[in-house]
Regions:
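Glycine-rich phosphate/diphosphate-binding loop of Rossmann-like nucleotide-binding domains
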Residues: 1-20, 149-242
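N-terminal alpha-helical transmembrane segments of multi-pass membrane transport
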Residues: 13, 17-18, 23-48, 56-59
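Flexible, glycine/charged-enriched surface loops at secondary-structure junctions
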Residues: 30-36, 196-204, 228-241, 336-348, ...
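N-terminal glycine-rich phosphate/adenylate-binding segment common to multiple enzyme folds
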Residues: 42-159, 265-269
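A structured beta-alpha segment of the ubiquitous adenosine-cofactor-binding alpha/beta core
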Residues: 44-57, 224, 228-257
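Glycine-rich phosphate/nucleotide-binding loop
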Residues: 251-350, 357-361
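Internal helix-turn-beta structural module
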Residues: 314-319, 337-398
C-alpha cells in the first residue's frame, strides 16, 4: 500500500469481530497502512465527539475509509456508558462532512434465495440522506385557524401560501431540501452507476408534488444531460426516471442488477424491504460516496448488542461477520484501484471469493443456516467461520 486507509473502529460485538477480521484475514496477507480512529462510544465521549469529525476529515483527505458499526446513544445508553452528552449519530456526522450518498446492496449466494423469485442480481439502494421529513418542523394545531407557508427572501421579497384553514384541531408539517444537496446526490448516483456499470433508476411523485418532487426530477435530468449522458451511452447503461409507485412495481417484476435512487424517506423504507427480501440485514453492504469521489465502506447493520452481552458473559456467539468483511474487501479494492495496485484489488476479490467458498461448503453462522437451501449447512461460531474463510483464502492466494 502507498496511501493509508482510514480505519474507524466501533462498538460492541462488531468491535470484537473487527479485531478478529483484521488479525485473521487482513494483517497476515496485506502490508496494511492505516490511519486509525477509535469511534467507540467511550472515546467519542472522551473527545467530545471530535474524533468523529477528525475521522471524516481524514476520509476526505485520503479518499477511502472503512468503518465498524457504532452506537448512536439514546437515554438508556447515556446511563449505561455514563456519557457527558447524547452524541449524534457518527454516520450522520460523517455523511454531513463528506456530503455523501449511502449505497446499500445485498451480498447474494446461490443457497439463499430472495423472497422475490425472479430477482437474479442484487439491487442497490441509493438513499438521499438529507432533509425532507427528517429535517421537518411540526406544529399541533389545537383550535380552528389558518396555517400558512411563508418564505422571506434576503432581497425582501415575500412568498406566502395558505396551507389549510382548520375548522378544528389538526397537525401541520413543514419540510425542505436544497438544490445543492439534491445536485450532490445526483452526481454521487451517476458516478456510482458508472463505477459499477449498472443502470440507474430514480423515482419521485412529481405528478402530485409539482414543485418539491419536480425539482428533484429536474435537477437529476440537468446533471445527467450535462455531465453523464455520453459516458452512460459509452458503457451501454441507462438512466431511467419513473414515478415511485411505478418504480416499486417494476422493481418487484425485475431481475435486479441496477441502482435505485430514492428520496430520503423512500430510501429509508425500501432499503429495509430489500435487505429482508434478499435474506438478511447481516448480508447487506453499505458504502458512502461523496460527489468528488471519496468512499467510506461499512456494514449496513448495527453493533449486535444482544450477542455482545452474551459474549461478555463468556457465552459462545455465532455472529455473522460477512458485511464487515465485505467492508474491508471493498475498501482495500478501492484503495488499490485508486493507487493502481493490482495486487490489492485482487486481494479484495479473493477475500470475497473465500467467503463464498466457505458458505458454498455449508459452513455458516446460525442466522444463515436457517436461510440456506440445497446445501447441508453446519452452524459454527464467529471465530470458526472466520477461521474457515482464512483456510480458503490461503488456498486461493497460494
Amino acid at each position: 500500500m502507498t496511501t493509508p486507509l482510514v480505519e474507524m473502529d466501533g462498538d460492541e460485538m462488531t468491535r470484537i469481530l473487527w479485531k478478529m477480521i483484521k488479525d485473521e484475514l487482513i494483517l497476515p496477507f496485506v502490508d496494511l497502512k492505516s490511519e486509525f480512529y477509535d469511534l467507540g462510544l467511550p472515546y467519542r465521549d472522551k473527545t467530545n465527539d471530535q474524533v468523529t469529525i477528525d475521522s471524516a476529515e481524514a476520509a476526505k483527505k485520503y479518499g477511502v475509509a472503512v468503518k465498524c458499526a457504532t452506537i448512536t446513544p439514546n437515554a438508556q445508553r447515556m446511563d449505561e456508558y455514563k456519557l457527558h452528552k447524547m452524541w449524534k449519530s457518527p454516520n450522520g456526522t460523517i455523511r454531513s462532512i463528506m456530503d455523501g450518498t449511502v449505497f446499500r446492496a445485498p451480498i447474494t449466494i446461490p443457497s439463499i434465495h430472495p423472497c422475490v423469485k425472479n430477482w437474479e442480481k442484487p439491487i442497490t439502494i441509493a438513499r438521499h440522506a438529507y432533509g425532507d421529513v427528517y429535517k421537518s418542523v411540526e406544529i399541533r394545531a389545537d383550535e380552528p385557524g389558518v396555517a400558512k407557508l411563508v418564505f422571506e427572501g434576503k432581497s425582501g421579497k415575500k412568498q406566502e401560501v395558505e396551507i389549510h384553514n382548520f375548522d378544528g384541531a389538526g397537525v401541520i408539517q413543514g419540510m425542505h431540501n436544497t438544490d445543492k444537496s439534491i445536485r450532490s446526490f445526483a452526481h454521487s448516483c451517476f458516478k456510482f452507476a458508472i463505477d459499477t456499470k449498472q443502470d440507474l433508476w430514480f423515482a419521485t411523485k412529481d405528478t402530485i408534488s409539482k414543485t418539491y418532487d419536480a425539482q428533484f426530477r429536474k435537477i437529476f435530468e440537468e446533471v445527467y444531460e450535462s455531465d453523464y449522458k455520453e459516458k452512460f451511452a459509452e458503457l451501454g447503461i441507462e438512466y431511467f426516471y419513473t414515478l415511485i409507485d411505478d418504480a416499486v412495481a417494476r422493481v418487484i417484476r425485475s431481475k435486479g442488477g441496477f441502482i435505485w435512487a430514492c428520496k430520503n424517506y423512500d430510501g429509508d423504507v425500501m432499503s429495509d424491504m430489500l435487505s429482508t427480501a434478499f435474506g438478511s440485514l447481516a448480508m447487506m453492504t453499505s458504502v458512502l460516496v461523496s460527489p468528488d469521489g471519496k468512499y467510506e465502506y461499512e456494514a449496513a447493520h448495527g453493533t449486535v448488542t444482544r450477542h455482545y452481552y452474551r459474549y461478555l458473559k463468556g457465552e459462545d456467539t455465532s455472529t455473522n461477520p460477512m458485511a464487515t468483511i465485505f467492508a474491508w474487501s471493498g475498501a482495500l479494492r478501492k484503495r488499490g484501484e485508486l493507487d493502481g495496485i493490482k495486487e490489492l484489488q485482487n486481494f479484495g476479490d479473493q477475500l470475497e471469493a473465500a467467503c463464498f467458498d466457505t458458505l458454498n461448503d455449508g459452513i455458516a453462522t446460525k442466522d444463515l443456516v436457517n436461510l440456506m437451501e440445497g446445501v447441508e449447512a453446519k452452524a459454527v461460531n464467529s471465530a470458526g467461520f472466520i477461521a474457515a474463510i482464512r483456510e480458503r483464502l490461503e488456498k486461493r492466494l497460494g
